[in-house]
Amino acid sequence: MLKIFQKAKNQFIRTSIVLFLILSFLILLYTFYISEINFQGSKHEKYIKYYILSLFLILFFLTSLRFSKKFQEYLVIITFSTIISLYTFEFYYFLKFDYRVTTVKYKKIVKESKIKIYEDFKKMNIQSIPYYRVEKEFLHNNQVIFPVSGVSKIKTIYCNENNKQINYMSDRYGFRNEDKEWDNKKIDVVLIGDSFAQGACVDNKNTLSANMKKKSDLSIINLGISGHGPLKELVVLREYAEFIKPKKIFWFFYEGNDLTKDLEAELSSDFLKKYFHPDFKQDLIKKQKNIDNLLLKDFRKKMLFENQTNDSITKLNNNHVSKFKDFLENTKYLRLWAVRNILKKNISKKKIDPEFKKILKLAKNEVNSWGGKLYFVYLPEKTRYQNTFYREVYSDQFKKKKKILDIAHSLNLQVIDVDDDIFYEIKNPTDLYYLHFNESGYKIISNHLSGYIKNEY
């Protein structure tokens, strides 16, 4: 009887180690899928630790099969105890916060292909161009040009977040303004930022700049461009805002991706880094005709590529991606999401790139040089309010908010924290968002900003 028990025990221990080995291999495969397929290798730095961990576990459990029975027994006990402890901790946080944010909670949005809309406009003899992010410099007549605006005076096919396609007519420099705004002898206020400043995804009358105009009789120019991070925003300031020298500039910082995806990509461009020299300038405001030609030519190349894509395959892939994202959200607890985030919060020493402070300092100095004032507007992402885990556990450390605001304060910038100053008093801030802000979100923020225009704060 004792021999049978011992044999069963040994078999259980060996089977457990093999199971741990298989799980380690699955972690490696999952890491490869997320890093190399889902993110196409763009986030190696983030996932390298999971590669190392999974490879270590595979080698360790594989080697342990040759260890003594006693060692294997202790290994199984310790491993199971660790797993049970971690998942007990994880389920506590899961039950407390229910940190899932799945796309099935959103109203399903049917988006027409921007190319299809472009083709429809073409049939009506309306010149248009789908909005797309400019991520590279162009060579024109042996001169390098890096545009930071769009094509001028053209119907721009922009975005759709609430089953309503948003298009706008760009101004003489490719921004989202009525062109006549540039004819004013004096421009009082300029907005600089990404898609939130640009007005995604609402009609012209509901953007930040439009709402702010309703509250004052001042001239306001919107220089927001989707996809811009801090360095490109510095370029916009120097190339366009400096030309009009407004009294006030509202610099919009979006916590969702300004310091990660956007700034990291911008700092990889040797050309854009030339703007760290205060005197460097392309004089883009004088080159709009060239910019138009370059962007239209580049778009035609992109359009040829998209037309060669099988539409049914694209829809299938989009559906697959949506379902996969829902699956990831619904299985966060299996991947110890809360445990990993708490460890990251307490262990991670990753600092804010010092170039960010340099950019803000350069921006402030340039605005001060013509007697203007720079306002730093901190915009919170929707996830901050969807997931109470972030508020309870991370607090002001979420997205390094406190450190970012400390940098702005250290430069004596006027800081407007939309999270604390506005949304804190609102019961359900998520009601103010589609993916970007909705009409109500833009309105409540612009009402607050209008107070700074009138010097009420």
Regions found by a protein language model. Name each.
Residues 43-57:
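Alpha-helical transmembrane segments of polytopic membrane proteins
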Residues 433-457:
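Histidine-centered active-site loop/cap adjacent to the catalytic His
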Residues 198-279:
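Conserved SGNH/GDSL esterase-like catalytic core that processes O-acyl groups on lipids
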Residues 27-31, 57-68:
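Alpha-helical transmembrane segments
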Residues 19-44, 254-405, 413, 418-426:
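Serine-dependent acyl-ester chemistry module
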Residues 4-20:
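N-terminal membrane topogenic signal
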Residues 69-94:
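Internal/C-terminal transmembrane anchor helices
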Residues 98-214, 340, 421-432:
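Membrane/wall-proximal cationic-aromatic binding patches
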